[in-house]
Amino acid sequence: MSNDLNIILAQLNFHVGDIEGNCKKILENVELAKSMYAADCIAFTELALTGYPPEDLIFRAKIKDRIEKSISKILQASMDITVIVGTPWIENDSRFNAALVMRDQKIIAKYYKKILPNYGEFDEQRYFTAGTETCVFNLCGVSIGLTICEDVWVNGPVSQCRDSGAELVISINASPFHQYKHKERIDVVWKQVSGNHLPILYVNQVGGQDELVFDGYSFVMDVDKNIIVEASLCEEELLLVAYDKDRQALAGKRPVSHKPDRLEVIYQVLLLGLKDYVNKNGFAGGLVGLSGGIDSALVLT
């Protein structure tokens, strides 16, 4: 009998504000994780239920009820699998950027993001209250720590997981693209793994949302600071990783993906951003102005 713990990182494209549609996608992938992969756990990205960034939608009167109804449905689907879902969570009139951990139709753990970014495209301190508690939960005999996005960019949250007994850390993210962002993510995670001697499973959102594009590129870094598996650029993917409980070692279920060059990355990100901007806004078509230059030729293709 295998002593592997099978964990899926769900790199998916969610739609801001479509809570019911995002819930449906989560449920479909929970079933896939159980039926096709025999997974013990599936982790979805930061604020997957509402899409990221929800901005002022978070203040709407009915948002709490819609979130709780969807979480109730996901709870019902959590028999025999642990489901980690990023969602806003409202408690005692405070709003948190949360990760809920569900198994066997119960919420077994909650984590509230500690480090709320408030620069550039981020305005999380306007919407959320920072969490203060560390979350380490038991998954089939393995102690798992949780962080959310910005938490891994600073000293503190990962080391607090280590000090609370975590054997590995799952980081759920909605980290938007810029030209050197993926290298920055890897460098940041490398420092956390190096300093805390914990492997980190990093799952990122994919898809365009207005001016932001999330490039995916989820990855797993083992305790020796090797990237053992990496998801694709700009594509939805369920990334499967196995943790050998006896050897305390991680293994990817497929090789590290093809590494596109810089121009290919930029092209794919622009393509995804434009496609999702059109589709998510329900546009039936568009008008393309062509001047005859190389920029117009690229737009036309």
Positions of the model-derived regions?
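Enzyme catalytic cores with a strong preference for nitrogen-chemistry domains
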Residues: 1-301
